[in-house]
Design a protein with these regions (language model features):
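A short, N-terminal "cap"/entry segment at the start of jelly-roll beta-barrel domains
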Residues: 1-12, 133-138
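Exposed alpha-helical structural elements
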Residues: 3-7, 17, 125, 142
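Short alpha-helical hairpin
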Residues: 13-17, 147
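N-terminal regulatory/effector-sensing and dimerization cores
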Residues: 17-127, 156-159
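A short, mixed-charge helix-start or loop-turn motif at secondary-structure junctions
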Residues: 105, 154-158, 191, 219, ...
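An amphipathic alpha-helical interaction segment
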Residues: 110-193, 197-207, 232-234
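Basic/polar phosphate-binding segments, predominantly the helix-turn-helix DNA-binding elements
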Residues: 175-181, 204, 208-251
């Protein structure tokens, strides 16, 4: 468990958007895709995930990792089939965004949605790299409460609004990770795809870069930190993160 504590501590979490949505007509959207992670809580009506026959009740949640396409049905009854491109072009015909905080969770055929980034050392998309599919979370009161609070803050202009939203978005990420671990979900994927996050040499490199800007960050110095050869350090870093170390430093 200590390994996952280190991973969570390394995560850079950024809030992207919050939406309180009323479903205007029943639709089935093919290949819904977003680079950001999305968590949705159903308030009233129906949401279905293609390939998953689980019955979803009000209060249940759906998590979609960034970069994972999903076919989703919103609303009850026979849906209209549309592409994601058509949905984005005519979004206002299908969804109504609501901004009155007193209506959150009180409107028929509605849901709340939060989108966010979660990157290990601000470089690697954590949930994307785990290669896990979208999944439902049954009646998780804490996650539901966090989403409600973020939606409420997002509708306000109170002092400290941004700070509250950032803190609660970080809590959402932690609760999702805890849910996955507690329920032993995706055990094989976690064992395979989280290994490199636990590599102490990689953690040493990330920590050194973070603490040494704008000092000596040459490959030679990074190799000394990780105790690998200068010729190998670039290949090693890219193999584990998908990016060259100097590109990461510039980013």
């Amino acid at each position: 468990m200590e390994d996952y504590n280190k991973i969570i501590e390394s995560l850079g979490v950024k809030f992207a958007k919050a939406r309180h949505i009323r479903i205007l007509q029943t639709i089935k959207i093919k290949n819904v895709y977003d680079v950001e992670n999305t968590i949705l809580v159903l308030y009233n009506g129906e949401v279905k995930l293609a390939g998953n026959e689980e019955k979803v009740e009000p209060g249940d949640l759906l998590f979609i990792p960034g970069g994972k396409a999903a076919t989703l049905t919103y609303g009850t009854g026979e849906p209209k089939n549309i592409s994601y491109e058509e949905f984005m072009t005519r979004r206002e015909s299908y969804f109504e965004s609501m901004t009155d905080p007193s209506n959150i969770g009180q409107v028929p055929n509605s849901f709340g949605l939060i989108a966010f980034e979660a990157k290990v050392f601000d470089s690697v998309n954590f949930f994307t790299s785990l290669d896990i599919p979208p999944f439902f979370i049954k009646a998780h009161s804490k996650l539901g409460s966090l989403i409600h609070d973020i939606l409420k803050e997002d509708c306000s202009d109170e002092a400290g609004r941004g700070r509250v939203i950032r803190n609660k978005t970080e809590e959402i990420v932690i609760e999702i990770v805890r849910h996955i671990l507690k329920n032993r979900m995706f055990v094989e994927q976690l064992a395979t795809n989280s290994t490199y996050f636990k590599d102490p040499r990689l953690i040493d490199i990330f920590t050194y870069i973070k603490n040494s800007l704008p000092g000596d960050l040459s490959n030679k110095q990074l190799a000394n930190v990780a105790n690998v050869s200068e010729d190998y350090v670039g290949q090693y870093f890219k193999m584990l993160t998908g990016i060259n170390p100097q590109d990461y430093i510039e980013y």
